Swiss-Prot record:
The presence of a 'disulfide through disulfide knot' structurally defines this protein as a knottin. Coiled coil: none annotated. Its main location: secreted. Ion channel inhibitor. Residues 25-52 form a propeptide. Keywords: Disulfide bond, Ion channel impairing toxin, Knottin, Secreted, Signal, Toxin. Disulfide bonds join C54-C67, C61-C72, C66-C79. It holds the Pfam family Toxin_12. This is U3-theraphotoxin-Hhn1q. It comes from Cyriopagopus hainanus. The keyword Secreted applies.
Length: 87
Protein backbone atom coordinates (compact mmCIF):
# COMPACT_ATOMS: atom_id res chain seq x y z
CA UNK A 1 0.00 0.00 0.00
CA UNK A 2 2.80 2.43 0.85
CA UNK A 3 4.67 1.42 -2.28
CA UNK A 4 1.64 2.23 -4.41
CA UNK A 5 1.25 5.68 -2.81
CA UNK A 6 4.91 6.45 -3.46
CA UNK A 7 4.70 5.36 -7.08
CA UNK A 8 1.56 7.46 -7.64
CA UNK A 9 3.25 10.46 -6.05
CA UNK A 10 6.34 10.04 -8.23
CA UNK A 11 4.18 9.66 -11.34
CA UNK A 12 2.26 12.81 -10.49
CA UNK A 13 5.48 14.74 -9.73
CA UNK A 14 6.94 13.56 -13.04
CA UNK A 15 3.89 14.76 -14.95
CA UNK A 16 4.06 18.14 -13.25
CA UNK A 17 7.76 18.43 -14.06
CA UNK A 18 7.09 17.47 -17.68
CA UNK A 19 4.36 20.10 -17.92
CA UNK A 20 6.64 22.80 -16.49
CA UNK A 21 9.47 21.95 -18.90
CA UNK A 22 7.15 21.90 -21.92
CA UNK A 23 5.53 25.17 -20.91
CA UNK A 24 8.91 26.87 -20.40
CA UNK A 25 10.24 25.77 -23.78
CA UNK A 26 7.02 26.76 -25.53
CA UNK A 27 6.90 30.18 -23.88
CA UNK A 28 10.43 30.91 -25.10
CA UNK A 29 9.39 30.07 -28.65
CA UNK A 30 6.13 31.96 -28.61
CA UNK A 31 6.06 35.51 -27.34
CA UNK A 32 2.76 36.19 -29.09
CA UNK A 33 0.50 36.25 -26.00
CA UNK A 34 2.87 38.58 -24.18
CA UNK A 35 3.09 40.91 -27.19
CA UNK A 36 -0.66 40.87 -27.63
CA UNK A 37 -1.32 41.74 -23.99
CA UNK A 38 1.22 44.54 -24.03
CA UNK A 39 -0.35 46.03 -27.15
CA UNK A 40 -3.85 45.79 -25.68
CA UNK A 41 -2.92 47.44 -22.40
CA UNK A 42 -0.52 50.00 -23.86
CA UNK A 43 -1.19 53.46 -22.52
CA UNK A 44 -1.52 56.09 -25.19
CA UNK A 45 -1.03 59.77 -24.50
CA UNK A 46 -4.41 60.54 -26.06
CA UNK A 47 -6.23 58.51 -23.42
CA UNK A 48 -4.59 60.00 -20.35
CA UNK A 49 -6.84 61.87 -17.99
CA UNK A 50 -6.72 65.62 -18.39
CA UNK A 51 -6.66 68.12 -15.56
CA UNK A 52 -9.94 70.04 -15.53
CA UNK A 53 -11.23 73.14 -13.82
CA UNK A 54 -14.08 71.17 -12.31
CA UNK A 55 -14.16 68.00 -10.23
CA UNK A 56 -15.77 64.88 -11.69
CA UNK A 57 -17.77 62.10 -10.05
CA UNK A 58 -16.48 61.01 -6.61
CA UNK A 59 -13.70 63.63 -6.64
CA UNK A 60 -13.01 65.99 -3.76
CA UNK A 61 -14.90 69.24 -4.11
CA UNK A 62 -13.72 71.50 -1.30
CA UNK A 63 -11.28 73.48 -3.44
CA UNK A 64 -12.75 72.75 -6.89
CA UNK A 65 -16.31 73.17 -8.05
CA UNK A 66 -18.12 70.09 -9.31
CA UNK A 67 -18.66 69.67 -13.04
CA UNK A 68 -22.13 70.21 -14.46
CA UNK A 69 -24.55 67.47 -13.50
CA UNK A 70 -22.91 66.89 -10.09
CA UNK A 71 -23.33 68.48 -6.69
CA UNK A 72 -20.91 68.68 -3.78
CA UNK A 73 -21.96 66.39 -0.94
CA UNK A 74 -21.99 68.40 2.27
CA UNK A 75 -21.26 65.30 4.33
CA UNK A 76 -18.46 63.63 2.35
CA UNK A 77 -17.14 66.61 0.33
CA UNK A 78 -17.30 64.59 -2.91
CA UNK A 79 -18.98 65.39 -6.20
CA UNK A 80 -22.04 63.15 -6.48
CA UNK A 81 -25.12 62.85 -8.66
CA UNK A 82 -27.96 65.09 -7.52
CA UNK A 83 -30.72 63.23 -5.74
CA UNK A 84 -34.28 64.48 -5.14
CA UNK A 85 -33.58 65.10 -1.44
CA UNK A 86 -30.46 67.15 -2.25
CA UNK A 87 -32.21 69.69 -4.50
Amino acid sequence: MVNMKASMFLTFAGLVLLFVVCYASESEEKEFPKEMLSSIFAVDNDFKQEERDCAGYMRECEEKLCCSGYVCSSRWKWCVLPAPWRR
